[in-house]
């Protein structure tokens, strides 16, 4: 895939803008949902600039469209050549990971789904992520389900769906949703996956978290001393900011316009990921239907949570558990977060309460003074 770009050199101040984590999760989750949703090529804008002449820190910036969302990065290095290399490397890796996890064309996941019932060889990174998704499904009592694909295809929320499917269609899809039917063989160099006929694997609620962590690791190996990667609201951080302090990440208010912040979390070297149903939904018959589906009822999850934010070094873990906790509701989510030792910020659906894990409470500033703050274990 050719990725046209624009590059230039310009002076810039070392000012750290607030980056907002949101619930948008537009990674195509099924072949039918993805069809026609993305342009054939990503058209990123890149630049390299001296971020701080006195300290000889250079900033590489990247912005483009990939995985159905806006991808951006600010990457810092000690010299201009390394910074320029970071911009190129980031572009290459984004394209590679999109190809790895695509559900379109002859992508490996699409091959597994099209050949349900037989073993299919896959990249071992895919096998590892599917195995991790199965663990989250098991430990969350199926509040997260990597075989949700048939339900996603029926509802198409965020992919053109604007009405409730028939009961018959929902029941038929539900019969195909069962993570225990996924078989994963992680033999090094010979990884493979098998699913039952009619099933399809959907990594839309975990893949971007994995990709964010992978990109951060790749950029560190390529010479980045610091950086911030934003995959449509899923934020992954490389170390601390160039100024040597934590990054400041805003948590979006669920009932407001994009970039309206209700809290700020200070963090370094982790992923900050948010789930909610406020950005992908439709209204029909006087009801609002969100995109996070229940594998038990087949309907959009009924929850008393407005959003869930998780801070974790493992982006895939944060991404998968965000979806699980949101669908589980506040009471079960708080119990699961404590058991799994997850650092969370949970907002109630009425936005009257914000639950914050004790481990991160000193790093969280609540901007909405109307919300009651509860620090939890």
Predicted stretch roles:
Residues 2-377:
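Mature catalytic core of soluble alpha/beta enzymes
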